[in-house]
């Protein structure tokens, strides 16, 4: 009880502190989970249903949007799982989807899923207070909406009110999911009952949602072409994991493309055993962290050439870092004197 009270006090302090008191690098605010303050009244964004694969995906939903979505999901299966891919705290104020927003949408980094969910539960203490929620532009608050909190609901509570299951895969935004979270998902997915339906979502319904939809399709199609799977996901609304070396991509975006292909290699090697070796163990034995000089060559099937040459042009958007897949090994490269 003492821990719960402490969490409640800290959460309230964060939510109610005037925005101008935050240092820019530590700024956290309540975000309405779409760019339009009235989006929660409209159609849910980035919805796609993949019938053959038994899954669907979307952006974050409001209470009203979830009611419509739940009706569709129940037509697909009696065994529906809502797979919440967000690390940042979120929930519903008066039915409106809101979340913590920090720099690079990075609120809650370092916290466990249990800690995050405990904070979300504790926010029922907001009832009766008035808060201001904002849309976000470049991770800064915009277009405030003042809300007198009459109702606070966690996503787990909302999901279970419709008779559905809830799974939290707490992943930070803008990067490939942590290895331990992928382990948890694969261990969950491999034991699903036949006919189960998974609905994935994150904030926008693209990056984190797409990563797990991609992994789930890979588990179902270990003999397919990885490029076909990645293209299928890109065509249906997931983040683009196809183009690995486009110069406009950030290091994190390029790394996601590489690690998606590495996960497919892992699945091909381990699905027949029922994934006795988990992803994080496999990656540990199939990865190398090295330092290279500009112009140095890495023999093997390279990221963009054969052999791989670490060059100014290759690393121009990666700030002296690269992640590449060479044969069956992932190389995490730091470029010296960049």
Predicted regions: what is each one?
Residues 3-4, 99, 112, 319:
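Compositionally biased, low-complexity segments enriched in small residues
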Residues 205:
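Conserved G/P- and acidic residue-centered "switch" motifs that form tight phosphate/ATP-binding loops
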Residues 290-338:
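Extracytoplasmic soluble-region selector
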Residues 208:
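Conserved SAM/SAH-binding loop-helix junction
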Residues 16-199, 211-291:
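Cys-dependent protein tyrosine phosphatase-like superfamily
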Residues 1-24:
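Gram-positive cell-envelope targeting signals
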């Amino acid at each position: 009880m003492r821990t719960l009270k402490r969490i409640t006090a800290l959460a309230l302090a964060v939510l109610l502190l005037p925005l101008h008191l935050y240092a820019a690098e530590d700024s956290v605010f309540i975000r309405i989970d779409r760019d339009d303050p009235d989006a929660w009244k409209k159609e849910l964004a980035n919805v796609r249903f993949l019938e053959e694969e038994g899954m669907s995906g979307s952006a974050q939903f409001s209470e009203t949007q979830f009611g419509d979505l739940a009706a569709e999901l129940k037509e697909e299966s009696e065994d529906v799982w809502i797979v919440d891919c967000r690390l940042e705290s979120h929930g519903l104020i008066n039915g409106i989807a809101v979340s913590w927003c920090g720099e690079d949408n990075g609120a809650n980094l370092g916290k466990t899923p249990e800690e995050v969910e405990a904070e979300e539960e504790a926010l029922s203490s907001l009832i009766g207070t008035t808060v201001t929620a904002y849309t976000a532009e470049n991770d800064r608050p915009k277009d405030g909406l003042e809300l007198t909190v009459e109702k606070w609901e966690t996503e787990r509570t909302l999901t279970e009110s419709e008779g559905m299951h809830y799974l939290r895969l707490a992943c930070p935004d803008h990067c490939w999911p942590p290895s331990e979270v992928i382990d948890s998902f694969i261990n969950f997915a491999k034991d699903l009952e036949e006919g189960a339906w998974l609905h994935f979502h994150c904030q926008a319904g693209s990056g984190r949602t797409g990563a797990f939809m991609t992994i789930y399709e890979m588990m179902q199609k270990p003999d397919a072409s990885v490029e076909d799977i990645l293209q299928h996901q890109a065509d249906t609304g997931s983040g683009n994991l196809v183009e690995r070396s486009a110069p406009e991509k950030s290091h994190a975006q390029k790394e996601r493309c590489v690690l998606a292909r590495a996960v497919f290699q892992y699945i091909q090697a381990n699905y027949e055993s029922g994934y006795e070796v988990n992803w994080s163990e496999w990656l540990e034995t199939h990865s190398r962290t090295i330092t290279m000089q500009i112009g140095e060559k890495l023999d093997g099937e390279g990221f963009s050439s054969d052999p791989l040459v670490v060059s100014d042009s290759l690393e121009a958007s990666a700030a002296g870092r690269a992640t590449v897949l060479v044969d069956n090994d992932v190389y995490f490269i730091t470029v010296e004197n960049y």
